[in-house]
Amino acid sequence: MRVDIEKMEVTVTVIVMLLSFAGGSNIGNISARSKNRGKGSMWWGIAKAGEPNNLSPLSPGVPYLDSSAYYGTLRRKQRRLARENPGLLDAIAKGAKMAIHECQFQFRNQRWNCSTRNFLRGKNLFGKIVDRGCRETAFIYAITSAAVTHAIARACSEGTIDTCNCDTHYKGRPQVFANGNNAAAVTNVRDFEWGGCSDNIGFGFDVSREFVDTGERGKSLREKINLHNNEAGRWHVQSQMRQECKCHGMSGSCTVKTCWMRLPPFRVIGDLLKDRFDGASHITTSNGGNGRNNNKGHSNRLPKHPKMNAIMSNSIHSKRENRRRLHKYNFQLKPFNPEHKPPGTKDLVYYEMSPGFCEKNPKLGIQGTHGRLCNDTSMGVEGCDIMCCGRGYRTQEIVVVERCNCTFHWCCEVKCDICRTRKTIHTCV
């Protein structure tokens, strides 16, 4: 009897060992995917697809952009959206580049300057700082989501996406005056007609949700934060739709006024998100898990003008997918300080403190502030005292060579002088 038991134990041990050898790699991959979920987005790499170091050699000395370079940064659902909406991927790539440019502009005078790397692996585009749930990561998610929304909405009105065009649902609606009153209560205000070509914010908002939020299930705390910050970026774009008008009439008169809705330059969105970054909401880590609460701070509403273009892909409109999509946004984040109100729809949220940016940290992709330019007369974040972290700074005089006194000569040439000026600069030691 004891021999049989020993044989059974040996058999079980061998089976377990075989299973571990056969499926160990898969188990490891699953755990790795679970660990890395919500930390960085591969699609960010689209912004670098056209960089020289990401081009393939067509022939010696003649590089070209392989079409697979774009698709290599995308998930299956994102590739499907790109196939079903020709022209969409170019708009998203433009949005990703806009996001990087705006992020670097907003933080140009701060210790963290939103530096990026020049390769296609999007998760590492901004460095490993996105592994932290800090304020800088919140801004990255919000600005990239906002830029994609802005770029898609504008691309629709420009006619560069085959499956969408101008937003025409304003036509036939009651006229809205700048002061919000009814026409009967307004004097000396000219009527207008809806016309022109409005930016399609409904399409941009919804497709941005489908594309940008792919892979974010909203189950863990980090995924909820990513979804919230992505939504915050989109709502900042949607809320900035503006009415533009053009007058028609003899001798500059405004006999007829035609109006349409248009998005502002993306700099306006960047400024708003930078303000939200400065006042970002610190949330508690007890927000994790699958609990769903009545959501008052985090809106499930679609855009103010949610009617989508009739020719948009049916896959985006499927009722089942719509219900599942809205369900993952149904949560309320709790503030770290119970006395503070919960974060609103447009607030940026974080749960980890930012790392130090004074010294170089290759692990997080932080460049440090050594060698950075600073302003010796400023008391702000760009001042040498703060930028250089108390290490001091060097002052040197350089000669700047630039074109000046440019004049236009008919036709068609611009001639400039070469000017040399001395300039004093300050760099952190």
Would you name each region that the model predicts?
Residues K7-I15:
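Sec-dependent signal peptide recognition
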Residues R2, E9, S20-I386, G390-V429:
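Long, position-biased, composition-driven segments near the start of the mature protein
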